[in-house]
Amino acid sequence: MNFTGKTAVVTGGSRGIGRAICLELARGGANVMLCYAGNEQAALDTVAACEALGAKAAAMRCDVSKTDEVKALVDAALQQFGAVHILVNNAGITRDGLLMTMKEDAWDQVLDTNLKGAFLTMKAVARTMMKQRYGRIVNLSSVVGLHGNAGQVNYAASKAGVIGMTKSLAKELASRGVTVNAVAPGFIDTDMTAALPQAARDALLPTIPAQRLGAAEEVAQAVAFLASDQAAYITGQVLAVDGGMSM
């Protein structure tokens, strides 16, 4: 994919899937502004990796649930690179637990980051994208948002909400040349899944027709396609990258 002359804002871009997305966009020539929640060194490492690919990149700490911090992130991207053409909402957290024992804080934290965060960033870039009559917004949902998962009522609600928000905003912005799509990863080999006991990892495989975990790069390639000019006639869609789990 060719992203020469394009600027992308990627939330949660320092590690895992977010890092892979930053590198994939940088590989195509995009300027990358990534935000991170707390791991500054990981963010700087990702910036350096993007620059090694020949791209311009920068990182900024941002709590995506805070309106002023999101505005500062987008303003920084506009000031440094002149425009924002692509937004990838990847920032997300989990606070798993069964409904009967889940604390209200665990619900609020997940919805604030995963759902409100995507709302705030989309709102922050919508005006500039509409004005330039070009934009690509890609939101990271999850197969859990499609099918639910015991012990993840908060995470499932947030990711299902992302899908509904994606489809609604796609209808609002389509006439202005702005597409809004979602990618729903399945079980991807990241730090989060690596922390699972081997027995739990082994139990996952029978639920995946492809019989393996996905790679972060495979999610990134799907995101890059939806962020590209080749996907100009695709909007309001959810692309599952899950080895067939959603069949």
Where are these regions (language model features)?
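Conserved glycine-rich cofactor-binding loop
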Residues: 7, 14-16
